[in-house]
Amino acid sequence: MIVRGKCLGRSVSKAVSLFSRPISVISAKSFATTTNLLQNSKDDSTEATIPWYMREENSSPVEVLNKIEVPELPENSPQSLQEFVTLLTVEYGLTDLEIFDLSQLPEDHPKSLEEQNEENYVILASGKSEKHIYKAAYELRLYIKHTYKHLPIIEGMSSNSISKVTRRRLAKRVRRGPPATASTFGIGANSWVSCGTGVDGIVIHLLSRERRESLNLEQLYSDEQENEESHSTPEIDQDRLFFGDRRGFHTSSRNFNLNTLSNIYDSYVIDGNFDTSQKFKAQFDLNFKGGSVEEYNKKFELYRAINLVNANVVEANEIEQIIWDKYSSLDLALQQEIDWNTEIIKDTIKYMEFLVDLNARHSPREKLDKLSGFISNITCFAGDSIDLFTIDKFGALLWRLTWVSENNNALDSANLNEIIKRKGDFEPGTNTISFDNELGRNIRELLRQNKYSSNKETFPLWLREQMMYTFGQAGLWDRFWRDWQSILQSLNKTNERIYFWVVTALFLSKVDNRDALRHLFTKYWSNPSGASFVADYTTNNHQFNSDNERMALKSVLVQIGEKYNTSPWAREAAQFADNL
């Protein structure tokens, strides 16, 4: 009989043969096995008597967690700073926190409170991974939203939650192949997230350890003396024979030669002129060895200075060739301590400043074409990707290249600040500029897409002022007043608005456009139904930010009243100056 594919008769015969074996044999084997088990159990009787759930585990000892280090807070810091520090360390698990009080920086520091009004305290923190940073930034945004009733400005936070439209666009870009300037198709890792909290001027940077080391933001927010003390010296290659003597000798030799070149450069800056340019150039070339990056940089500075004085001695292409000689130098390639990415950034900025100095010898389009080719070539020497749009000076110089003037004189924020410092007793050089409107629009859009792409972000105040002054000196007054109104509305503090009113009056008086002055004094100066200087001046208890500011405004109002004394608005401005 077959059941489920097996022979039942065969199974029965096997069962019969099994049970027909002698019982004594089976019992003997079973007894022997039991005896062996008992003997083995005697060796470890203690463990056998303890139930399995009460036995000690042979796991490794539990590691003691590192204690959370909370940095000390600056003196007289707001309570919100303590809240954010506790939140980042205790709640989010971020480490290596550093707090910078920007009020302690020198006045000439680019991040001091005198130079900018947006940041008061800066917090740097490190995350374990990109996911950790994204999670912390997400929770931080929710905390600020529910606690302070507004959304912070967050940059660098990238989520995988992409809309269907964006996915289709990315898929099309993948089929076309990656562009020459990017390989991530706009989706970068959360290695650096910046959060402008909008609370007491506190800005928080969340970075991965690798990105924090490469960016070195501590240097940006620290004093220069502190940076020099904390700067780590490059490692010495100890595998080489007599490494100490050899490297020390070459370093001292390079420093000596650099001092000689620096003295020649300083002498030319002080005593050089059109006739002596060739002599200084020959003396410099005779002592130039090219053994260090600093020597090439000093040569670039001297050649650039000579080109401004006598372009027949040093031509523009010779200045650019200095940079290419530096990157093709075999001696420099063997020096492992050189940070080439930093050099590329510095050389790009220097080259842009050189293009600005060329003035009217080249049009804005020709200058930007030169810059495009230069950046395309120099970035080939970069070990890692470099994002020039993260550098503020790059954006400022990029906008500056959109216009030229006859003698390169133009009003900017530095000139207006100098007028205030001298209480109005300063006459900066002014000139009508030639602005390429289409090119300026393209540059503005380029900056917006690459650095200020979020709809909630706008250009920083200093860049918006630079653009506004460009429009005014180019005679584009419609765009000037449009940007002027936008800036005025963005200023929430009365003292900031007072300062903006003063620099506007100074700017228009130096540009000396009668229609623009009339527009200011008839529409905005004492407007009862909108924004006006008189209203802000009254709200500020008839006070200026400084006596220099008051004297500078008084001086310029008197000049306007004297020059346009036949106009009622000018006489009204002069009467106001008499009461200051």
UniProtKB/Swiss-Prot annotation:
It is a peripheral membrane protein. Keywords: Membrane, Mitochondrion, Mitochondrion inner membrane, Transit peptide. It is found in: Mitochondrion inner membrane. Its main location: mitochondrion. Residues 1-38 form a transit peptide. It comes from the Eukaryota. Signal peptide: none annotated. Belongs to the ATP25 family. This is ATPase synthesis protein 25, mitochondrial. It comes from Candida albicans (strain SC5314 / ATCC MYA-2876) (Yeast). The gene is ATP25.
